[in-house]
Amino acid sequence: MHHQRILILDYGSQVTQLIARRVREAGVYSEIHPGDVDDAFVRDQAGQGLKGIILSGSHASAYAEDSLRVPAAVFELGVPVLGICYGMQSMAQQLGGTVSFSDHREFGYAEVRAHGHTRLLDGLADFTTPEGHGMLKVWMSHGDKVTALPPGFKVMASTPSCPIAGMADETRNFYAVQFHPEVTHTVQGKAMLARFVNEICGCQGDWNMPDYVSEAVARIREQVGSDEVILGLSGGVDSSVAAALIHKAIGDQLTCVFVDHGLLRLDEGKQVMQTFAENMGVKIIHVDATEQFMGKLAGQADPEAKRKIIGREFVEVFQAEAGKLKSAKWLAQGTIYPDVIESAGAKTGKATSIKSHHNVGGLPDTLNLQLLEPLRELFKDEVRELGVALGLPPQMVYRHPFPGPGLGVRILGEVKQEFADLLRRADAIFIDELRSTIDETSGKSWYDLTSQAFAVFLPVKSVGVMGDGRTYEYVVALRAVQTFDFMTADWAPLPHALLARVSSRIINEVRGINRVVYDVSSKPPATIEWE
C-alpha cells in the first residue's frame, strides 16, 4: 500500500528530522532524502502517493556559487512546495528572484508580521498589534535573505530587518518562510505544517498505528516466508518492539539472543526474560557473558576503547550463538528512522561523529544473513506507540534511553565488577524515587517529567562520617535531563526534597558510597552521558 506522502529534501539542517515528525503528527507519512537527489528520483516519487514537497534549512549559504540547488523537477511536478530558510532562498533564486548576503543576521526569537491572506498563514497569529497586524512568534536562523521576489510571488511575512520573511505563489501552491516552523519556539509552527500537508497538499491523514501494525505484519510474512529469523534482544525499546512485532507476524520462526554483558540495570535480565519468554512465549537464548566482558575490559579506562571492546565482544558472543542456528536465514535489528537518516548523512559527509555507536551493524556481512528491519520507517515516539499497540508493558515501552554499552559508559575509567554492582543499586534507588515522587503541579511522576535519568559512578573516594567512625568511600553523581529531541537538553530542576531522599537512601543502603552529587550541566556544552 502506498500511503499519501510528503517528500522532505534535506540540505543539512540540524532540525530536519523535526519537520518529518511534525508532518507525521498531522497523520501524514513523510520521508527525508538528501537534497542532492536527481530529477529522476523526484519524478519517481510522484507515482508513490506524493502529495507535497518540503525543502529544509541548511547551515550553508544559498548565496554561494557552489551551494546545492533544488532539483528542477520539484517545481515541475505540480505538487505544493514549502521552502524553509535555505529552502526559501533556493526557491527564490531558482525561480527568478534574488538572494543577497545580509549585514544583519537573525538568530533566535523574532516577531514576524503576516501580510495579506494566504492559505498557509490566514488566521494564524500569536498576538495583534494596536494597528491590527497579526504577529507570529518564531525562531529565525539565517544570514542570507531574499531581496527580490520571483515572478508570480507576493510577500507573505516580514520583519523590520527582513522585508521578505515569507513569500507565496498561490497559483502554483509554492510557499516559503525564512523562519523555522518545525521547532517548538515557533508557536504556530505545528499548525502551519499541519495546514500545509492537510489543506494545501490535500492529505487525508492515512498514517496511523493500527493500520501500520497490520501492514507491517503482512510485509514481514511476505518478506520472510517460512524462513527462521534471529534477533539480538537488549531489553531496550527498539529491539523489544521489533521482537514483539516480528513474533506477532511469524511466531516461533523468531529466536532472540539476549546477551547479558554484566552491565545491565538492576534485575533487567529477569525482566526481559519474564516479559518475552514467560508472558509472550518468545523463544530466547539467554547468554550470561559477564566474565568474558569484564575480562576484556580489565585495565581499560578510555571511553572510546571501552565502547569498541563492548561492541566487539557483543558481536563475538552473538555470532557464536547465531552460528548454532543453522536454519536461520534472516537477522532482525531494531533500526529506527533516525538511524537511517544519520547513516545517509554520514555517507554524504553531512554528519560528524561525536561518539561511536554500539550496534550490530557489522553482523550481516559476517553471518551471511539477510537483514530484516521492521522499524526502519519509524521515529522513536512512533516505536513507543507501536509497542503499546502490541501489548508490551508501558513501563518497558516508556523507559528512559539506555546506552548499548550499558553501565560500561556510566562507570568513569576502568570497569570493575565491584563498581558495576554499586552503580546498579544506586541507579535503581534514583529511578525508584523518581517514579514514586509526584509533581503536584502536573500530577506526573518526576520519572515521566524527565527525558533521561541515571546515576554515574565516579572512581574517586571522599572522606565521610558514619556513626562515630570515619569513612573513605566512593562518589556517585546523579544526572537527569529534560529535552524534546536529545539534540539539546537542560538539567532537570528536581525538588530538593527528592534529591535529599535519594542521597540518604543511597548512602544508607549502598555500602561503599558516602557522597552523592547532582549534575547541573546542560547540553551543550556537556553531553547527556558522561562518557
From Swiss-Prot:
Pfam families, per the entry: GATase (PF00117), GMP_synt_C (PF00958), NAD_synthase (PF02540)
Active site: C85, H180, E182
KW ATP-binding (keyword) present: yes
GO CC field: cytosol
Domain Glutamine amidotransferase type-1: 5-206
Tagged with keyword Nucleotide-binding: yes
Any one Gene Ontology molecular-function term assigned to this protein's record: GMP synthase activity
InterPro entries xrefs: Class_I_gatase-like (IPR029062), GATASE (IPR017926), GMP_synth_C (IPR001674), GMP_synth_GATase (IPR004739), GMP_synthase (IPR022955), GMPS_ATP_PPase_dom (IPR025777), NAD/GMP_synthase (IPR022310), Rossmann-like_a/b/a_fold (IPR014729)
Binding sites annotated in the UniProt record for ATP: S234, G235, G236, V237, D238, S239, S240
Pathway: Purine metabolism; GMP biosynthesis; GMP from XMP (L-Gln route): step 1/1
Keywords: ATP-binding, Glutamine amidotransferase, GMP biosynthesis, Ligase, Nucleotide-binding, Purine biosynthesis
Catalytic activity: XMP + L-glutamine + ATP + H2O = GMP + L-glutamate + AMP + diphosphate + 2 H(+)
Domain GMPS ATP-PPase, residue spans: 207-399
EC identifiers of the protein: 6.3.5.2
Oligomeric and partner information: Homodimer.
NCBIfam families hit by this protein: guaA_Cterm (TIGR00884), guaA_Nterm (TIGR00888), PRK00074.1 (NF000848)
Role of this protein: Catalyzes the synthesis of GMP from XMP.
PANTHER family xref list: GMP SYNTHASE [GLUTAMINE-HYDROLYZING], GMP SYNTHASE-RELATED
Protein name: GMP synthase [glutamine-hydrolyzing]
Originating gene: guaA
